[in-house]
Amino acid sequence: MNEKKIPLTIGITGHLNPRMRDTLALRDAVKRELTKLRTRCPHTPMVMLCSLAQGADLLCAEAAEEVGVSLRAVLPMEQAVYEKDFEPKDLARLRWQLERAQSVITIPAKAGEAEDKDRDALFRQAGLFITEHSHILLALWDGKTENQSDCGTAAMVDAALRGAWKPQHGMACRRAENLTVIHVLTPREGSADPGAGTMNVLGDQKKLEEILARTEEFNRLAETAPEGGESLLPETESADPVMKKQEAVMQAADSLSLRFARGYRQTMGILAVLGTAVALTFLLYDEANLTWMILLCGIALLAAMVTLNRAKRSDQHRRYIEYRMLAEALRVQLFLRYAGSRTETQRIMTWTEQQETPWILCAMCALNAGKVPEKIRDIRDCWVEKQRLYHEKAGQRTEGKSMRNDRLLHLAGICAVVLYFGGILFELLCGGLAPHPPLPVRNIETWRMILKILLGTVSVGTLFLASYYGKMSLERKKADHRKMEALFRTVGAQMEQFGQTEELMELLAREELTENGNWSSYQRDNAPELNI
């Protein structure tokens, strides 16, 4: 069940030498915070990212173990080298935590550099990896910034809150307001400062609440999504736990998006029909003097208002958009990882996407917290060519819908013109515009009423088309599919000529995410509404 869910990832940074007498207070403070988060998000699995260094790191890992929070270890170097930093009394604690960890991620050294040449750089890389891939950074810190090293706790807090450090290997911290630091006051050994274990939230707490709420909402709904689904990749690749997790969440997001898309389109259809019914019944009430039509008009209007209110309360439109955005971002990430690329989608999301859907940005960060891909595989058939064919066929389907809508609008226009000139001819021949009509008819007002009703019906039909097909953004979608089909065709040709380069894969991923963001931007303008 948890495979389909986005984990709430708690990153750890802290001092190597907290005061021994504060150990119990600090451990209790960490356990309280973890328990509070679990209570706040009961459907969301929690994972701790921790380097397991002596001092605060090991203390937090042990607190997490006591409250049942999973652990992913992030080591700055190979375990055998890392263990040299540990005193004998802490070495057993380290090895036990590594044994219970879900996974052990070793941050690779800078290309061409020996692992022991710049240990501070390696520790900084591990700290920044944790910072980037966490929803919340839990900092056991004394709050002091002077005389701090580049890889120390203060530097990591600064990176989390201001994005102050640009890590190596292309890692980049995201927008500062999308990451919150929970500061646990932690005096160092030899300090006389009071207040050990005092909690303080640094960063945008309102933004954190939004991210937690959206993540919890998705995970609760993911429990109702069907299990499994057709894999995008060969079955043999399921051994990669990061890819397996990403694909499971992607399938849940895709299933939920389709569910809410059906609800959204059904709502749009109902509102279009009811809006048309309101206009038509009022027209008959007004022109045909059918008094009872006003009752049908009121019933249709009430039903439309109830439908609109229900759609807004269910939030189906937003969920449809955001879950599709999540599914698309994960699909792109899945192909990148399969290809052996180290590009992570959260690093290339557009600024607009980061602002509008910070919870998706955080989800991608959490789901990319794993070992770097080791194998390089050909993705031309399973990604490039399949996506080209998808956009080609989707463009054709959208063009078909657009042509049907255009034909109906054209027909409505012709009918309106014919009825308009028919009305002029009627008035010229039957008495409205001529003092001595050549073709006087009896009951002229009845015929005039019928003509008005016919003209009004054509207008009502046009209103229906605008209320339903107009919300589908067919022309925009058709253009987007054409552009993306051309992109995949061009990239496929370049891969044939130059090979599957990292630059081409990143370009492709960036363009797909940009298209995803563009789609969400204009789709947000198509929220359900009642047009009368």
Residue positions per predicted region:
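Acidic/glycine-enriched connector segments
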Residues: 1-194
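Conserved non-transmembrane functional hotspots
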Residues: 200-414, 421-532
